């Protein structure tokens, strides 16, 4: 069997697994944007079942064999396919020792935690969320302990997951350098800066007008409105289920319209990536594979 034939078989496995991943994502979107409070527990349970199915499909012996063999020898594959194998292998190495039961329990814990976090945030009472957070931390430590390639600390491992190569020492050096420039600048502004009018920024602005302006901003950024939806949530985010189904969220404050403007422009920046990635990326399961740093930094340029 050629390497291309192996990749074709792997793609079929990923095609099926991706159906479950999209289903989980759509349930999560609904839970964060429109699900009634009393329906969140059921949504979380449904998501855990679907996540378990995805996990099992990507942890079969056949899947592992294809990924490891193609990682060892990728001759004949396209550059995009080689990058896909690189990402899949890295994920496999991190997750291969996690039992399905632990993964299922982690999914349940994360889903339960969201509703707890929402209640705590709205009540401004951290104690309402602390128990759920402690449970998540415990499960995270269990999963990290199962990895064969260890990092100096749990936090180092999570930083590397978020941004490949990230570490505490790297960020300490970065923030030390940033602090050396930023602190003097802030002090200079405080002592020498001219007063700037800000009273208009808290002027009441009807939510309906903010929503209409948000839609205008998204069109101004060049987004395809027929492949886009705009909704509200407690903490804004952008997600997608292919280039033709991109979902942007924002949060309106009647007395802080500027917050929504910045949010919409930034989330619209994420949406631009999602709508414009090459079709090949989606076909070969390479979409959304850029680093978080790239996604966030370039999306912020639109503000």
Feature map (PLM): residue ranges:
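A well-structured
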Residues: 1-166
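Short, extreme N-terminal leader segments that mark the start of a protein/domain
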Residues: 1-10, 255, 280-281, 289
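Short acidic (Asp/Glu) and glycine-rich catalytic loops that position anionic groups and cofactors
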Residues: 24-31, 88-90, 193-194, 244, ...
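Contiguous, non-catalytic segments that form substrate-binding/exosite surfaces or channel walls
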Residues: 106-257
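An N-terminal structural lobe/cap that precedes and organizes the functional/catalytic core
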Residues: 214, 243, 263, 274-287
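Active-site recognition of the HExxH zinc-binding catalytic motif
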Residues: 259-278, 296-299
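Divalent-cation-assisted or electrostatically stabilized phosphate/pyrophosphate-binding catalytic cores
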Residues: 287-293
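Conserved small/polar residues in nucleotide/adenosyl-binding loops
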Residues: 301-303
